């Protein structure tokens, strides 16, 4: 029995020493990669954003292209449903890995409200743009480059009209995202369903006017592949302004027991939440 106890203690010492050495190696690796923001979990997030944006664009823009090439067999409501379902499915597929942004405007909105690290923003945006461009390229190879098959977004009216509706619909989208995905009081399991339904509604509303982009990557990807840049600024400025405004609007109503001046001075809403929880427990 004594021998067994000694053996166990020796193994425990080796395990502790090995764990300590591994911890030091991980700490050194984290310090060495801090400036580059390169780690295995981060790379996994980037890959998830690439795949998520790719499949979202392939499904949504694919529906647009097929509907145009097959004399409207899918129909406009059908296209809206495809966009909503594609978003919902991909949120549930990779949301637990990367947060399922798939949208530079959403990522920027989270960063400005203190819910996403600024240093990771460029990599996320590049991943989203890459996924959107690759999906657009795939569709171009499959269906050709005829102008009537262009899966991008173009205003049907004035640029101002399209800009305003892009701001409003993206505001609506980001407001919903902030509510269902970042508020602990919300039912997180329904996030994908709520966001997908919001996309569906927005496409039905804004589709005939602006194409219902709500996402710079959704418009820039097809534009890069097709070389069609008409009014592209509308689909960059509109979603960015709408998303940032939507995120901040929800954050203003999130802290109902804090004075407005304290909310606006806070640079990190997560830190504010931590302070509120600490005060409540005290």
From Swiss-Prot:
GO molecular function (one): channel activity
Entry membrane topology: Multi-pass membrane protein
Pfam hit, one: MIP
Extent of motif NPA 2: 215-217
Keywords: Membrane, Repeat, Transmembrane, Transmembrane helix, Transport
TM region positions: 46-66, 74-94, 125-145, 162-182, 186-206, 232-252
Disulfide bridge map: none
Motif NPA 1: positions: 103-105
PROSITE patterns with a match to the protein in the record: MIP
Main location as per UniProt: membrane
Coiled coil regions, renumbered to chain: none
Subcellular location: Membrane
GO annotations of cellular component type: membrane
Domain of life of the native organism: Eukaryota
Annotated domain remarks: Aquaporins contain two tandem repeats each containing three membrane-spanning domains and a pore-forming loop with the signature motif Asn-Pro-Ala (NPA).
The family this protein is said to belong to: Belongs to the MIP/aquaporin (TC 1.A.8) family. NIP (TC 1.A.8.12) subfamily.
Function summary: Aquaporins facilitate the transport of water and small neutral solutes across cell membranes.
Alphabetized PANTHER family for the sequence: AQUAPORIN NIP1-1-RELATED, AQUAPORIN NIP2-1
Entry protein name: Aquaporin NIP1-1
